[in-house]
Amino acid sequence: MKFRLLLTISIFSFTSPMSYAAKSKLEVYGDIAQYGIPLTAGLITAIHMDGEGMMQLAEGAFWTAATTEILKVSVDAQRPNGGTQSFPSGHTSAASQGAAYLQFRYGSVYGIPAYAAAVVVGYSRVEANKHYWRDVAAGMALATGIQYAITVGGISATNLVLIPYFDGDETGIYASLSF
């Protein structure tokens, strides 16, 4: 019971009003909770004194953010409001990464409320006319997949080697992953 209360208070403590006068409360929630959920995951991990888990959380956050930004620039999909870089939703991928970590590392007691909060982040992005549902779904799937590979699959950057390859007109990347 104490853990659920701590999780709820932590997630919603990041939703206090700031200088977002032109935005709806739902949009402000999405803006803040994209950071609040992963920060809450870090707080829970610290309470558990789980060093390995903290590394998995940090690595998942890094790879999720990097992959999201690479896709945004590469795809450059138009937003519903006419802006660019709609695909995938960065807010949703950030929130979902924290939720996925909590689910895979500590189970449903933490994972379900965190995923519920992440779904609201995704909903806020669609309601704010910033994303289509496909952008939100892709952000959630991307973050969940990356965090699964790290937390459950044991895949880590410490097991990955990337070396650029240049030979005349040929350019490439040598990649090696040990399991």
Q: What label would you give each PLM region?
A:
Residues I44-W63:
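Interfacial segments of alpha-helical transmembrane regions
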Residues I37-T45:
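Hydrophobic core of alpha-helical transmembrane segments in multi-pass integral membrane proteins
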